From Swiss-Prot:
Full protein name: Spexin
Subcellular location: Secreted; Secreted, Extracellular space; Cytoplasmic vesicle, Secretory vesicle
Alphabetized GO MF terms: neuropeptide hormone activity; type 2 galanin receptor binding; type 3 galanin receptor binding
PANTHER family hit by this protein: SPEXIN (PTHR28590:SF1)
Organism taxonomic ancestry: Eukaryota, Metazoa, Chordata, Craniata, Vertebrata
Region spans: Disordered: 56-75
Sequence ranges of Basic and acidic residues compositional bias: 56-73
Residues making up the propeptide: 27-35, 50-116, 74-116
Keyword annotations of the record: Amidation, Cleavage on pair of basic residues, Cytoplasmic vesicle, Hormone, Secreted, Signal
Sequence positions bearing Glutamine amide: Q49
Expression induction or repression: Up-regulated by enucleation-induced adrenocortical regeneration (at protein level). Up-regulated by dexamethasone (DX) treatment. Down-regulated by adrenocorticotropic hormone (ACTH) treatment. Up-regulated by hypoxia in the carotid body.
One BP term from GO: positive regulation of transcription by RNA polymerase II
Residues of the site described as Cleavage: R35, N36, R52, F53, R72, N73
Length: 116
């Protein structure tokens, strides 16, 4: 019984190796090999892809040559911590003053119960 099963496993392994070799014959020999583009193909690609055709190295060089963009206004006056806290507390108190005393919160709670 061992003879036919060993023979079947060997045949399947050989078939697997041959199929892998057959499929890899169409693959390029070297991955680092660059394609020799004709000038006409270069123009086509540049038109089809726009600025995305520019190589990554030249794009990185352009970004490195540019000065970093200013993100802050140079004349910005920063608030101190007590000033920021006072401004925050004033903004919290402001809506309570605008509400007045005529707002009934029980109506809001009743409406919420119906939508559960």
């Amino acid at each position: 019984m061992k003879g036919p099963s060993i023979l079947a496993v060997a045949a399947l392994a050989l078939l697997l190796v041959l199929s892998v070799l057959e499929n890899s014959s169409g693959a390029p020999q070297r991955l680092s090999e660059k394609r020799n583009w004709t000038p006409q193909a270069m123009l086509y690609l540049k038109g089809a892809q726009g600025h995305r055709f520019i190589s990554d190295q030249s794009r990185r060089k352009e970004l490195a040559d540019r000065p970093p963009p200013e993100r802050r206004n140079p004349n910005l006056q920063l608030l101190t911590l007590p000033e920021a806290a006072a401004l925050f507390l004033a903004s919290l108190e402001k809506p309570q003053k605008d509400e007045g005393g005529d707002f009934d919160k029980s109506k809001l709670l009743e409406d919420r119960r119906f939508y559960w």
